[in-house]
Amino acid sequence: MTLPVGVSIGERIGALRVEAGLSQRALAARANVSYSLLTKVEAGHKPASAAFLAAVARALRLKVGDLQPEPYSDGMGPKEPLLPLMAPIRAALDLYDLPPQEDARPRPITALRLAVRRINALAQAADYKPMCAALPGLLAELHAAAHLMTGEDQRQAWGLLAEAYRCGHSVGIAIGLNDMSAAALSRMDWAAQRAGDRAPGLRAAREYLRVTAYLRTGDLDACRRLQDSGRSYLDGTDPKTPGALVAAGQLHLGSAVVAARAQDVDLMTHHLDEAERLAQATGETGDFSLHFGPTNVQVHLVMTLVEASRHDRAVAAAKGMRFPAGWAPTRIGHHHIDLARANRWMARPEAALDHLDAAFAVAPQQASRHPLVRETVSALSRAGGRRSSRLSAWIARTGI
């Protein structure tokens, strides 16, 4: 069934239910969910939790992604301007197992380290056009360095290659190319295995990143399995293992989000507490471009409260927050997206738009594409009343 752009999750469920010939009571009974909750979700008065979506999808014999708007499901819009830049990245990901080109002359490891830091900074700012233009050449250079260098420089080159592969995931997941994201993270693990004492942390970080695609489709079981896998790579490590504490802390933050999606607030709080304990040990750190530390724990507290439908508590927890200089724009942007969601559910449309504007100011490409932004704008557009110029601008920006 093809539905127009901008249709909400609740409206999609209603349309697909009617197509299946089911009344609301019949679907609620088949999915084993509350009839009252189903009616409120369809009407846009309650958010659809991951567990709710999974139950309804099973009852309708559909995938969870079928109930969600793009880009939760695979594929990207036909007007995506980054499309012409994807082919060279895909080629670099595909040709990973070939020997370096004969004329390859990689720069010294110090220069390569700086180049990887710069390209990851572009990814963390959602500045995808220059990142995508530079990524294939940098991957080729790092690939050559990993094969041609020796000793500690070679191990470092493998680690840098793993970090650079992560950028393919960053753009892939942003524009709905989940297959490219998965390929990039597979190559990240391939390189990380050869990175010496950085291997455990990098491999654990890769599992943390893999969760995103499954979280977007509501497959919480897959999320938990990946997080357990990530922790297994840290077995036998200690605080001196490069990146181990950072990866462990980030896995706890990811687990807190999954617990919040499942409405398990006690488990959510446990993981946040564990992340806070590790953040006090690490401080603010840029290891693996994860930006783990006390600030990220606070950001995830707000995020998880939104996911757990504690919207007033989320807004209160965000008061007075300050971000470290140079902190990842996409992290700041996502924080404002979460606050826009909270304010939308609290029937505060102007505050929701304020946070959408703040997200756009810090990371415009992220805010323009993010499925949670599209979902929020779609809900605001259906709320009734006179449509403001700001809301109209967001409708145009997101293509709702």
Q: Residues of each region from the PLM?
A:
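A detector for short, charged/polar N-terminal pre-domain segments
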Residues: M1-S8
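Short basic helix-loop element that most often maps to the first helix and adjoining turn
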Residues: E11-R30
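Recognition helix of helix-turn-helix/homeodomain-like DNA-binding domains
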Residues: A31-P47, P69-Y72
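Conserved binding/catalytic microenvironments
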Residues: V5, A104-I400
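DNA major-groove recognition helix of helix-turn-helix/homeodomain DNA-binding modules
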Residues: N32, A51-D66
